Amino acid sequence: DVHPTHYGRICPIETPEGPNIGLISSLACYARINEYGFIESPYKKVEDGRVVGHYRIVKVGDTDFSLNEIVEKKELEKANRKVAKAKGKGQPAEAEPYSFYLSAWDEEKYVIAQANAVTDDEGNLVHERVIARQAGETIQIEREKVDFIDVSPKQLVSVAASLIPFLENDDANRALMGSNMQRQGVPLLRTESPLVGTGMESTVARDSGATVVCKRGGVVDLVDSNRIIVRVEAEDLQTGQMKEFGADIYQLTKFRRSNQNTSITQKPIVREGQRVTKGQVLADGPCTEAGELALGRNVLVAFMPWRGYNFEDAILVSEKLVKEDYYTSIHIEEFEIEARDTKLGPEEITRDIPNVSESALRDLDESGIIRIGATVKQGDILVGKVTPKGETQLTPEEKLLRAIFGEKAGDVRDASLKTPPGIEGTVVDVKIFSRKGVEKDLRAKAIEETEIERMNRNIQDEIRIINEARNKKIAEVLSGEKMQRDVVDFKSGETLVKKGEKVDRETIGKLSRRELLALPVSEDAREEVRTLIEQSENRIKVLEQKAEERREDLEKGDELPPGVIKMIKVYVAMKRKLSVGDKMAGRHGNKGVISRILPEEDMPYLPDGTPVEIVLNPLGVPSRMNVGQILETHLGWAARSLGLHFATPVFDGALEDEIHSQLEAANLPVNGKSILYDGMTGEPFEQQVTVGYIYMLKLSHLVDDKIHARSIGPYSLITQQPLGGKAQFGGQRFGEMEVWALEAYGAAYTLQELLTVKSDDVEGRSKIYESIVKGEVPDDPGLPESFNVLVRELQSLCLDVELLKE
């Protein structure tokens, strides 16, 4: 249950729906855990009805403050004004806003006002009496008696709930579903941030670690699909601190499998030559666009029934969403195979598999492992493996012949890794792990070489940038120095700089270390040049040392479980387009399953001829009380027409009047409705329909992962009945109540088949095939194996049951 002390500490909305409801909770947005393990929530101080802004001093500058001192805003401004007026260049103090964190016990003693209490420019509370909390009770109280005020209206809820626009207009149960379902959103091929957000999107994207964030400011030196190199600029560093020179290399993740089998891919959003600052987003992650969270797509929605296809939360979508890859996602499956050391001898990863045609091996390399880029479907071999099989005892003569002629094929069987049913895609990656001390195969060596090559390329780039930065610095040091004699190239003997001239950066780049140290300049300048050269060389030495360690790590074998010689992982990527049966949802708990994908020309269309992209049932709104989706739809329509993105923060969002004014500004109907025309007949519908843009997500409950069919497959050892579940390639359970249904229908033979030949009548199920092929009437069913199991169980109780024939 929700307790008053949860306020600002534990989110009352985000919790699972099942048996764990209320047992698993999330921290609220601003909550933190103190040194004793208790949750604290931040508040701003209120004195005599005025909100006092406090700041913590981060840099003292030339003020009288001490570091980390807590001061009022007016004191800080006064001190900084004083420094600015003083003669010379005084450094003002730098500070960050400070809040007072209170635990639940501390909070009981104070009167705390709500964040949306009206204040003037000075921070004074406008109303005589304000709504506040005291000892867990909500009261109205004089403004002078207020001690603290909330930091923000979204202090109450967690991060997931704070991403729902118009949360205040949604019922709590649906908000709970909305915050939980955002976690199930599938990363799409083409991301798009929401037209109507809450302002938290960029914060969440940055803090999630999905994006690549700039560590140190500088200029982008190189960008490609795999890495971003930022040349750290000297302006950001203290002068002469060579250790800070050089480059930051950001390696981007490409097509990595997540735990949900979705694809983690990062793509750069900066250009070469662009100046970047610390904390700036350099590359988008799997669910972000331009550094903002982007879990779904904005689609044009109409709230209306359409020929029964959106009955009971079903969703009707336009073919345009499939054609233009709106909801196409990439999924990556991992398949693993181990070669073990068995009692009969070691298993072997090989291309040489008995009784397999050459066409089935066409995509395997000489090591027996599939090549990257191969297209695979059900039953294709991914990794060839043979395992020794226990032979019947050989006579000594046969053993001798085997030893002489190397007749091997007879004593191994095929145990290859094959593509399971329902998988069709492209091999994107292969990983090979070999035991220490075991000779690596050609493929493993090739993978290792590629990795070392990539590492070397990164190091060469870093060394290049360090040397360029060093040369730039040396040029600055020598900018005021004239050469005391001619500078001659040691090798060729040509004069590079004449006496009395200055040396430029280009010439410095041509000079060797020895020549740089011998430049005819003043002693001070030469000493500075020597220091810079030594610092850069030390930096390069450290880089090369790290690379050498990494190389040794790569060349060493891997730690594998006992008995495993080699382990191979193959990653297959699949493109999944939107299909009937996929689950979709908005951010307000408005979830549904796609019932039909309709041609664009048949969808209802607006008066200007624009067909809608998705049709939702209006009956899904009133009883569920998630009206936020309707307000989002209205504001989204205005946003798309105006070419803007709106942020409506939780509990502080856009009001109805503000939505009206935005719709007016966009020259759209103020009521958010429009006459629609039937795409099939061209006739207008009777009434106006609510139309607009809504943000919809595709959830990771995809029909392709769930659909399953079985004809003949594995059986349980004891009962001889088919196994259950998709993972075991099992059948569907035909339970007690399903039997009643068939009995009620009088479908006697169907029922008999289900209970015998389709289940555990071992003899009958092998004979039925024969009779179907020959077109004969099948024999009477035999005895189900489960009856034999029952007899055995009774025998274990010392009850002998015999089957007597008449």
Please name every model-derived segment.
Residues 1-806:
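Intrinsically disordered, low-complexity regulatory segments
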